[in-house]
Amino acid sequence: MGNRREFLTATAAGLAAAAAPARAAEERTAAPKSTPAGAPPFGMPRDMVLLNMRRGHGYALGVKTKDGVLDVEAAGRALGMPVPADMDELLQNGRGPALRALIDAVEAAPDGRFVLPEAGVAYAPVVTRPEKIIMMGFNYRHHAEETGTPIPKDPPLFNKYNNALNHHGGTIALPTQAAREFDYETELVMVFGRECRNVSEADALDYLAGYCTGNDFSARDLQTLTSQFMIGKTSDGFAPLGPYLVTADRVKDPNNLKLKTLVNGRVRQDWSTDDMIFNCRQLISFASKVMTLKPGDIFYTGTPQGVIFGEKIPRKDRAWLKPGDEVVSELEGLGELRFRLV
């Protein structure tokens, strides 16, 4: 992993000698090849595993290290360095160079004061204020086949709202007065780090800040009431996301990742993102021709086969999810997302 990934802490006394110049920090931020003339610099740092933490009535940014979680706010305050307060500020205001400068400083003079034990972290959704939560339906060939759905010719996009956002270690209060057919959908989630409009497939991935694990939790009976999915998709807490945002440079091929779902310890989905009908590049390019994608927007890319909705028995006989169940979603290299139903 190397020293660069060992984001240790520093003392204020070591700051003057340790802090990297802003110019050097900017050189280590990712910049899309297709950056238009005059556009602001792309502000996401490279080679990081980031997380959002709940703190009081707000959120705080953390960086996962081999020793725990670097508390960005605490380190910045102690060292007198301006830093992004949370993930949303990092993404939406392009504060990557500031975060990189802080990490350079704390790596050079470690003392452990700003590293939190991860076991005690109160996770927040990776992103808490996206302008858009874009969802993709029936994007895995075998999932479409198991549900008897024709292979789509164009991406069938829909949406969730911010009330659906949830976090690693969270709970979902099932809306049992409105529905009973609750189902899991583990998905690869793309998170945007730069404004994106009318981009080519070749350049599409350059606009991503990173990737994370998500679950498109669903109420199938509400979903199938009409031709519109939304009512069965965006109840409170129906979009768990996390625990980490892994920066895009760490993911060599988002369409070659193992994906798994477990319910109460039993494997229910075990597949790969290489079964997508529309790959990540195609999804971004398609959506960018319809709307402007903004930093902090999140894009769920669909789920593979193995959902309850695809079982070949009558719906009334299926073992739909219920209060007390624990769901675990895993994406290779992106972390394990856990949540419980109540």
Predicted regions and their residues:
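N-terminal non-catalytic cap/leader segment that marks the start of a structured domain
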Residues: 4, 11, 25-155, 326
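Catalytic-pocket segment enriched in acidic/His residues
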Residues: 34, 38-41, 143, 173, ...
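A generic local secondary-structure boundary/capping motif
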Residues: 38-41, 49-51, 123-125, 145-148, ...
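Residue "hotspots" at secondary-structure boundaries inside conserved domains
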Residues: 125-126, 132, 180-182, 285, ...
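Short, structured patches in soluble enzyme cores that scaffold and shape functional sites
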Residues: 138, 160-162, 169, 176, ...
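Structural signature of FAD isoalloxazine-binding scaffolds in flavoprotein oxidoreductases
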Residues: 150-168, 184, 323-332
